[in-house]
């Protein structure tokens, strides 16, 4: 049955809200409720969130646990930061694939309040200030205009959860139908859309920077790629952005399981487009 995605800064009250939701649904629907979260993974969060690969592995483990628990009867609550829009999109693809309704509960706090609540925790449960600040800086707020962030319920510190509205969103709304893009999306690769967006942007900026000291005929090395750009002519920002959009659209429909190859694929695409 439905997936409830918690979202918010570290120490923003997500776990308390997840527990309130579990208690409500257990008492009022009789359904089994599963809370999946960072704590279940037995992690040292300061170590994990300081290392991008460890964090990526954590997201993959959480997504896999959600996928295992989603079924036609139970409610699953994912109690984690869920702060990357690409990861939320991947979870949206998962629920479309399994024909399951979902909603997002956004625990909205200020950075100062989250920092204050962090200091109130037991010492072994606190984030370091450096990690806390970094996560807040990287946070990508949900936007109800994005289908993967909708329905969206934004809850501030003193608000009560709108239980009935959340129930309506989960039980009276049809699950999103699968379509070609979600069938093609490689659900086994964590954060595919985020990586696609980031890597292609990095390649684009590397090309623009290298062109300042290059001339037609040069080979341009790109960080993260073994392939090189064959600079047959100069490319301006407008053209590069257009090519990047075209490549992203194509790759969404024809995804690769190996996200480490995205940079090489984009370089090859640019080389073909210049000839």
From Swiss-Prot:
Report whether rRNA-binding shows up as a keyword of the record: no
Question: What is the superkingdom listed in this entry's lineage?
Answer: Eukaryota
- GO BP terms in the entry: tRNA wobble uridine modification
| UniProt-listed Gene3D superfamilies | P-loop containing nucleotide triphosphate hydrolases
One Pfam family matching this protein: KTI12
SUPFAM superfamilies xref list: P-loop containing nucleoside triphosphate hydrolases
**Quick one: which residues bind ATP?**
8-15
Q: Which UniProt keywords apply?
A: ATP-binding, Nucleotide-binding
Q: List the disulfide bonds.
A: none
* Family from the record: Belongs to the KTI12 family.
Q: What is this protein called?
A: Protein KTI12 homolog
